[in-house]
Amino acid sequence: MSDVLAFLAALDCRPSAVIVQTPDLRRVAYYEHGTVYTRSTDLAVIVHELWHDCQRQRLGDAWDAEEQARREAEAHRVEIMWRAD
């Protein structure tokens, strides 16, 4: 996990979210108000969800569907960067 935090810090992201392993979750993972719920141990998934925490720290909650889609695309790009590293 320290590798994940170092990677995110290099992108000026210092998440404070709590990660909750939830084996019976329908989705792989999701972020909600400071908590990442996940059934995955894939660190790329964790990177993606923690990025959402940093987005919320910087900008607050998404104000509409367009902003939510923009943030999702950005988190996906960060996840791809992690996978390529």
Task: Briefly describe each language-model feature range.
Residues 1, 40-44, 65-72:
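Solvent-exposed, acidic/flexible segments
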Residues 44-57:
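Active-site recognition of the HExxH zinc-binding catalytic motif
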Residues 11-15, 65-85:
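Post-HExxH zinc-binding segment in Zn-dependent metallohydrolases
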Residues 55-66:
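Substrate-binding clefts and substrate-entry loops adjacent to catalytic sites
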Residues 28-29, 54, 73:
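Small/flexible residues
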